[in-house]
Design a protein with these regions (language model features):
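Fungal-biased detection of long, low-complexity, Ser/Thr-
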Residues: 263-348
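Loop-centered beta-sheet repeat module
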Residues: 153-228
Length: 348
């Protein structure tokens, strides 16, 4: 199936939405990242974080809500839209989000879900920003206090981050900064945008010869090399980015197979299933890199061909057979097929 075709994409998107609808209010199984100070802090997930307690963990719940928001906004006449809106109405109440703010402000939680979960929360806020659904305006205001707490932590943390984290999992700096930068631009927060942009250039502008042949590690769901390149195209003009990429990544000037999709050996294993997410994120990062180059750059063909291969491989694993992947892969699929990262306007 060619998911780039509009009708096929809508069908696939509805299937992915079902994965999120099935888990945003499913409390168990659950893996909480919970710092406790005493016995009184022992509570079930629905009481600790009543907006984002489903989908196995907090960050997956957040981007599950992002998925529902994005699809209901893109396909308002679809069968999934009213179901998505109903789920969002339950989760994004003022009371629930007030408790989320109380929770993240608790003692010992200064680094809660930093940077990955924070980045997705900011994406959810950005997705609500320009939605003409009447309830969305209410939800946008409900989530604003939590948003302000979390982006203020980014503002405090980034200047202290001496070195970027170059892993292929949640702690990776490059991927999170890309989502955060996109949020800052959508929110028209010039101060935070400038901070993030400057740190990106300080961290990565001198990097050369990224060893992509060392990738992936066994539980990666993000590519360190591709995430960095996809980030840099957001802060450089096409001509600047083309020169930087020359030194950073060896991409052929022809439509040849140069980066093969990673192999998933066991989708019932929560860590090994990360590889499906890697293929999906590689696909959107390759597309993003191609979009940042001058239109006649000869590397675009190879980047686009590799993106298509990774998309095809990654989408195979996006289903409800195993909750290990089903609770989160739908969000990655939607980020890819709806071109979310590519569509954000970048500074030229």
């Amino acid at each position: 199936m060619d998911i780039t075709h509009a009708s096929d994409q809508k069908i696939n998107s509805e299937n992915f939405a079902k994965l999120a609808l099935d888990c945003v209010h499913k409390e168990y199984p659950n893996k909480i990242s919970h710092t406790m100070q005493s016995d009184k802090d022992v509570m079930p997930p629905r009481e600790l974080t009543p907006a984002f307690y489903g989908c196995y963990d907090w960050h997956s719940s957040v981007h599950g809500h992002w998925l529902l928001t994005r699809l209901a906004k893109l396909y308002p006449d679809s069968e999934l839209a009213p179901k998505a809106i109903a789920a969002l109405e339950i989760s994004l109440s003022e009371e629930n989000l007030q408790q989320e703010s109380v929770y993240v402000s608790g003692k010992g939680r200064k680094a809660f879900e930093r940077p990955y979960g924070i980045a997705w929360l900011l994406q959810l806020a950005a997705e609500l920003d320009d939605w003409d659904e009447p309830l969305a305006k209410e939800w946008r205001e409900n989530i604003r206090p939590l948003e302000e707490i979390l982006f203020s932590r980014v503002v405090e943390w980034l200047p202290k981050l001496t070195y970027p984290v170059r892993s292929g999992q949640h702690a990776q700096t490059a991927f999170a900064l890309g989502l955060m930068l996109d949020w800052a631009r959508t929110a028209n927060n010039r101060e935070v945008e400038s901070l993030i942009r400057n740190r990106i250039l300080e961290f990565y502008s001198d990097d050369k010869k990224c060893p992509i042949h060392y990738e992936p590690s066994g539980a990666d769901f993000l590519s360190p090399c591709l995430a960095e390149a996809d980030l840099m195209r957001r802060v450089m003009s096409p001509s600047e980015f083309a020169v930087w990429l020359n030194d950073f990544l060896d991409v052929p000037n022809s439509n040849t197979t140069w980066l093969e999709p990673a192999i998933v050996s066991d989708r019932s294993d929560p860590k090994l299933a990360h590889i499906d997410g890697l293929n999906l994120s590689r696909a959107w990062m390759l597309e993003g890199i191609a979009s940042g180059l001058p239109p006649k750059d000869l590397r675009i063909k190879a980047l686009s061909a590799a993106a298509a291969e990774h998309q095809e491989s990654g989408l195979i694993g996006v289903n409800s057979e195993f909750y290990e992947g089903g609770h989160w892969l739908g969000s990655f699929a939607i980020y890819l097929v709806t071109k979310r990262g590519v569509l954000i306007q970048k500074i030229k």
